[in-house]
Amino acid sequence: MKNEYIKIRGAKEHNLKDVSLDIPRDKLVVLTGLSGSGKSSLAFDTIYAEGQRRYMESLSSYARMFLGQVEKPDVESIEGLSPAISIDQKSTNRNPRSTVGTVTEIYDYMRLLYARVGIPHCPKCGKAIHKQSIDQMVDRVMLLPEKTKFQILAPIVKGKKGRHEKVLASAKKSGYVRVIIDGNVYELSEDIELDKNIKHSIDIVIDRLVIKEGIERRLTDSLEAALGLGEGYANIDVIDKEIIKFSQNFACPDCGISIDEVEPRTFSFNNPFGACPDCVGLGYTMEFDEELMIPDKSLSINEGAIIAMGWQSCNDKKSFTNAVLRGLCEKFDFDLDTPFEKYPKKIQDIILYGTDKEINVSYESQRGKGIYPVVFEGLIKNVERRYKETYSDSAKAEYEQFMRIKSCKSCGGKRLKKEALAVTLGDKNIYDATDMSTLKFRKFIDELELDEMQKAIGSLILKEIRARVSFLIDVGLDYLSLSRNTGTLSGGEAQRIRLATQIGSGLQGVAYILDEPSIGLHQRDNDKLLATLKHLRDIGNSVIVVEHDEDTMMEADYIVDIGPGAGEHGGRVIATGTAKEIMENENSITGKYLSGKIKIEVPRERRKPSGFIKVKGAAHNNLKNINVDFPLGIMTCVTGVSGSGKSSLVNEILYKALAKKLNKSNLIAGKYKTIEGLEQLDKIIAIDQSPIGRTPRSNPATYTGVFDMIRDLFASTVDAKAKGYTKGRFSFNVKGGRCESCSGDGIIKIEMHFLPDVYVPCEVCGGKRYNRETLDVKYKGKSIYDILEMTVEEALEFFKHIPTIQRKIQTLYDVGLSYIKLGQPSTQLSGGEAQRIKLATELSKRGTGKTIYILDEPTTGLHFADVHKLVDILRRLCDSGNTVIVIEHNLDVIKTADYIIDIGPEGGDGGGTVVAAGTPEEIVKVENSYTGKYVKKYLEV
């Protein structure tokens, strides 16, 4: 009999307190609760991990070696579990070669469609290409100058791995003498051994001729032989010049250009046969930029204008680079004390790009003084050469600070060879088709006019493409293009793409586990997402969603509320049942927010701005050359549907432009004309959800700076002074006080061949990171390790008599992080937790009141109660005179904002304009504002 429930017994993973519960199968189930309450521990670290582990167990040990293995979660038993698929937000592919089209496999079908029914054109003149006859080939060769030497080649292997022994033996048996392998000539009488793991290209030399009268007959016979062996292909190798390619398939009669047979790989930018050779299919190149090498052109060279790698000392008169520049001065009559921007264009170009004229460099080294004739290659070419010549990764990283990503000049950012871009369907090449928004792309596919032959070949391919594109549109991604790089997607967008891919797979009997799929989604598009989740459920799957969105909870079949608090105060099942049952449960904080018993209040009055930052002519991505006024001294929410242009405006233009001018950063802002009002600010800070550190050595105590104070405190104890210990003794990052057996990590990594690496506590220090002598130093009976193991709540009580330390810890408590340990490794913190640690750090600083804070969807991962705290914190930042700008979809945050800038009205091409700007009360009166429509009911309550 089929289990109706997933029966979990004795789950103790992380902070779960021996949780036992029954989750109904084949239903839409929401797991909710405060941040850190244990939702993810139950959903991902218990249910998903066990489902994955059981699947892995069914595979051979050989297969498991390649896949890695999931550890058994700390749970007594789980019954009724299906194979589990996790769709979280952390597994976004950051590979620059990965696009929306490739991850959804739509691009694979597009490559097949263009290869089978696309119409090839001449890359030079644009005419449609047809098959070539042998007579046309002979006529083309005879146009070469008289006495030109050439050889006729039969291409028999094109970029394929293997030893190709049979191919070479067959050529030898047929009486041929020579072959060209990977550009090198070999005699077939030799023993030719090829590396089977490398791709090879092999041409048989059919004949060698010289252009003169009367060779047409022999040329025709040789071409026929070459075409026969080369399956319709023949190459003419004009000695020391060009290779002319001939094909019985495609050739331009006017230009004489032949192209290879069109195959799916012709359209792959990840394959050398399709990729643009200059950018190798990336669509961009890295180039040294004069703006980064000479960031402040108001300085002279002697004042340090040039900061490029290898040229930092060019203002030192003892350096060789300075001697070279002095030689330039003598030759071209300028001096090194003039501001760089005051030099004529000609002099600037000579410094940057060099000169072919010889200059005399007078230089005194340890070996004596001399005059050296030098041809100056220019600053940019010099640094380029050094970059190419170095083998050091650290040196390359240093050079790359002065490089900027620029669209490839050869392909215009389209990634493909010109031959691939010359194949069209419906008057569009494959790049133009995939560069449209998915909504326009579906219209293009639906309106394609094909002849009967093309329909017969392409109908099945088009059916697959339509289905997959429709799923993307259904999850609210109608504004994305298939050519969009996945590295530029938000966590929510990446998750919804994977969700669309899963719907396309049509699997049944699976447990899908999702992590806040509503992130980054405007309320308008929530219905589409819910319909998608219900569709997955209706075809016979269990859909378990970790979610805080009110609409999703109200539509769920079953809710599990975990809490009551976070960390040690959480890990229990507080309430289960339908939304109605949760609302009636007195113990459930979630229920109280859903029923309106507790709510985030609308402010009685909105703050008035103290001034404005005026952005004019914003035209980055889809922004339509707009002017936007950002009010200062208050909290502003930038709203709009997904893809409307919020991030382009706030993150790409406002933040990067202000960071460059206020923080002196090297960031490159998006396209805009001017920004006014900068004199009212002194710095800009982006508080995002990126980790506070990349290694376990980074933790909340080190990030907030409170650990420095704690180390000072320990160094001032009687014990420490008696032993001569300084503050550095209590650091686990440097030798002295740390345990040297584990280098202060507290854990040792043991490599297991057929199993995942195992981390075990260090035997010497017992996982305490410090040596015995350091741990013997106590403050109020606690060692430095004991302090790091304290939760924020415990530390607040422990340090209550030391105001400087207590103030910093208090801000961590205020942002809702009472449950995390001071020494909790940064790798164990969620994005939301990392963001709140950054907020706490800012709150603990004594501000100037002239700071502008940028936050992008800070409510990610936050429960209603956490959002309540967040709103209070953001308003506290404004109380000090600071400016807060938040990109947000959460209506509880939007309704508490002093000012709203609504971008839209739609996503992609249909967005990019300011729909409305003003207080929430003013926004609700604007008819075409989707945000106004949804926030209205929140203001009326």
Describe the function of each predicted region.
Residues 1-941:
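Conserved phosphate-binding elements of NTP-dependent enzyme cores
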